[in-house]
Design a protein with these regions (language model features):
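Positively charged, small/polar-rich N-terminal and surface patches that mediate targeting and assembly
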Residues: 1-203, 208-211, 216-217, 221-243
């Protein structure tokens, strides 16, 4: 049994007949390539978002997608989210502007606008089957010139700390923030999740100094150790989260 990817336009799809000459939709579950959750950030030349705002928006977008009813058992996104979350929770952050970013609004996902940043998280799939509109967006070198400031603490929200020991681009930092938020969601009690939801899935991202990081490592409730696909060595502790 094969499951078709969620239709990004929301329209009804049908299985081609034997006389239909249109190309068959590839079965994502038959791919041998790694799966990833793609994220896209808006990066307009005239109004570039701050580094920390992108990280906070990305983390919230990840959680919004994971808590969407369509990601729950029985939902149309569930087979894809479950398959991906059962393995390495890889995330790929892309950037685009203008019409390039507008076009990806039609793809299934969850979007967050926060403090001048706009980030959309997409239903996971194999890295060799990224929708064309999304595949056109740039991946490497996503680094914002302005760091910005962490958002104010929000009751029920979480704090994510990024390591000061290893340099990371904005794209990498946003992915790590998303990992930390996802792990936090999985570690929370039901009551803690409800409080977080009431906060609007608020995420505050901070960049501690080395001493503060060492203390946070001892007290944080979750820690992210990166797989080492890009920028950092495998096993690097890249982010922490607490609430």
């Amino acid at each position: 049994v094969s499951i078709e990817p969620p239709d990004p336009t929301g329209t009804t799809t049908s299985t081609p007949s034997s006389t239909d000459s249109s190309p068959a939709v590839p079965d994502p579950f038959s791919s041998t390539r790694p799966w990833a959750m793609q994220l896209a950030m808006r990066d307009e030349r005239a109004s570039r978002p701050a580094h920390l705002a992108v990280c906070e928006a990305a983390a919230s977008a990840v959680v919004r997608l994971l808590t969407d009813p369509r990601s729950a058992p029985g939902g149309e996104w569930y087979p894809f989210v479950h398959h991906w979350a059962s393995g390495p929770i890889r995330k790929v952050v892309r950037r685009g502007r203008g019409v390039t970013f507008t076009r990806i609004q039609e793809l299934a996902g969850a979007e967050v606008e926060h403090a001048g940043a706009q980030v959309r998280a997409f239903v996971p799939g194999p890295v060799d089957q990224v929708p064309a509109a999304l595949a056109k967006m740039q991946v490497g070198g996503t680094d914002m010139p302005e760091r910005g400031e962490p958002s104010a603490p929000v009751e029920g929200g979480i704090t994510v700390a990024l390591t000061p020991l290893t340099p990371m681009t904005t794209g990498k930092s946003a992915a790590q923030s998303g990992h930390a938020a996802q792990l936090a969601l999985g570690e929370m009690t039901g009551d803690e999740q409800l409080l977080w939801e009431k906060s609007g899935w608020a995420v505050r991202v901070v960049t501690p100094d080395a001493a503060e990081w060492a203390q946070a490592v001892r007290t944080a409730r979750v820690a992210v150790r990166d797989g080492g696909f890009t920028e950092v060595a495998p096993g690097t502790r890249t982010a922490l989260a607490w609430w």
